[in-house]
Amino acid sequence: MASQNRILVLGPTGAIGRHVVWASIKAGNPTYALIRKTPGDINKPSLVAAANPESKEELLQSFKAAGVILLEGDMNDHEALVKAIKQVDTVICTFGRLLILDQVKIIKAIKEAGNVKRFFPSEFGLDVDRHDAVDPVRPVFDEKASIRRVVEAEGVPYTYLCCHAFTGYFLRNLAQFDATEPPRDKVIILGDGNVKGAYVTEADVGTYTIRAANDPRTLNKAVHIRLPHNYLTSNEVVSLWEKKIGKTLEKSYISEEKVLKDINVSTFPHNYLLALYHSQQIKGDAVYEIDPAKDAEAYDLYPDVKYTTADEYLDQFV
């Protein structure tokens, strides 16, 4: 039962981690959050801010009030990490791209603790074993894939959560740079706009993650979040928006050659985001067939989940 599955979230105050924590609490799981003893690097470059107004301190107070058990520790304190892990059944890591390789320390602690029934390494993007991405995102995907291989080699029970495109990255501005909401006059579309992409809200990522964590069917499998109403081409997304505002946008289609050139001359975060857009909107890295022996579709597993559709998500910007 969900109430018996104790869940530890690593990276609990991040853009995705906080949603995993709230989903765990909502599902009735005893929920633990590992809080660093020392502050993180406030000067590290940020890709996208969490879509929540709370400061870290406010969020932690909200967690405590909701019954989350806060544990102190970090990746460089092996004893504290093992102690935290021994208290739970499932470990969910939501680290950002700069900390992917630090997960080898988590795996080492999980092996020593000897009690973990499931580990979710920090994935929360496309399937890193199925992609055609370019730099600067390719090295991050390669690091995530290398962590998969360590997990498998060490015999750690796992679930890989492949959620593809967060609405906060791709949908809130129709993938337009330096915009915080969808355009009302002109829109830039990468490629021909006819490649399917998969969109999901960060809150729904939390929901599906916890459903998978409580589900024996997802053991040692990759769970893919490609929701029927959110599996859309760029042209379909733009059309949804045009219908809402009652206006046809002026469209500029950018060739792959131009996109690759722009990636090479841009700096962070533009080059990184543009490479993500290229991966989904041009290369079609959300378009593939799954292998039922090692994969599962989240929608097929949990058709009862009322997820936010792309159409509903865009309503807030009208």
UniProtKB/Swiss-Prot annotation:
It comes from the Eukaryota. NADP(+) binds at G11, P12, T13, G14, A15, I16, G17, R36, K44, R148. One of its GO terms (molecular function) is 2'-hydroxyisoflavone reductase activity. It catalyses: (3R)-vestitone + NADP(+) = 2'-hydroxyformononetin + NADPH + 2 H(+). Keywords: NADP, Oxidoreductase. InterPro entries: NAD(P)-bd_dom_sf, NmrA-like, NmrA-type/Isoflavone_red_sf, PCBER-like. CDD domains: PCBER_SDR_a. Its EC number is 1.3.1.45. Pathway: Phytoalexin biosynthesis; pterocarpan phytoalexin biosynthesis. It is an enzyme of class 1 (oxidoreductase). Disulfide bonds: none annotated. The active site is at K144 (proton acceptor). It holds the Pfam family NmrA. Gene3D superfamilies: NAD(P)-binding Rossmann-like Domain, UDP-galactose 4-epimerase, domain 1. GO terms for biological process: lignan biosynthetic process. Reduces achiral isoflavones to chiral isoflavanones during the biosynthesis of chiral pterocarpan phytoalexins. Belongs to the NmrA-type oxidoreductase family. Isoflavone reductase subfamily. This is Isoflavone reductase. The lineage of its organism: Eukaryota, Viridiplantae, Streptophyta, Embryophyta, Tracheophyta.
